[in-house]
A protein has these predicted regions:
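Short aromatic-glycine-enriched beta-strand elements
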Residues: 58-64
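Short boundary/loop segments of OB/S1/cold-shock single-stranded nucleic-acid-binding domains
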Residues: 29-46
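A short macromolecule-binding patch
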Residues: 68-77
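Flexible glycine-rich surface loops and low-complexity tracts that mediate binding to linear polymers
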Residues: 88-125
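C-terminal motif of bacterial Sec signal peptides marking the signal peptidase cleavage site
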Residues: 13-16
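C-terminal partner/receptor-binding element of secreted or periplasmic proteins
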Residues: 118-141
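Bacterial signal peptide processing site
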Residues: 18-20
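Sec-dependent signal peptide recognition
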Residues: 2-8
Length: 141
């Protein structure tokens, strides 16, 4: 059982380094973004890093780079704030750093292929097609 768990964790660690998002265009958001957050408070995260533009796809899913990038699952305590005029700010619950959707960021964490049930709100089918990025520390570029 311990060997299976170790292999599982090694697989997640290795796949977390394989994300390479591309850059999407910058436009005001006409769809209400859906901030998916972990239900579990933690002070650790995976160690991979991805960089790109924080975007919202046509279904309201928040991604990094383009509409085929993994859905971002934000740390426990993360917040979404409507700034008006189609602008939204996300405050990362892991580091308390904030970024406006459309900004270039670097986001720590790692790729996760299994749909998590330990999130709020539940992940919709429209957001579940391209895997998940379990977010850690964030830095605005």
């Amino acid at each position: 059982m311990k060997i299976q768990l170790l292999l599982y964790l090694m697989t997640i660690s290795l796949t977390s380094c394989m994300v390479k998002p591309t850059i999407a265009t910058n436009e005001d958001i006409s769809i209400q973004p859906v901030l998916i957050t972990s239900n579990t408070r933690s002070n650790i995260s995976m160690m991979a890093s991805a960089q790109g533009k924080l975007i919202v796809d046509k279904s309201g899913c928040i991604r990094l780079g383009d509409e085929t990038a993994p859905l971002i699952i934000w740390p426990y305590g993360s917040k979404l704030e409507n700034l008006g005029n189609g602008k939204f700010k996300i405050t990362n619950g892991f580091t308390n750093q904030s970024a406006v959707i459309g900004e270039q960021i670097s986001l720590g964490g790692g790729l996760y292929e299994v749909k998590s049930t330990q999130v709020t709100p539940s992940i919709s089918k429209a957001c579940a097609d391209y895997g998940y990025w379990l977010a850690g520390p964030m830095e605005v570029k």
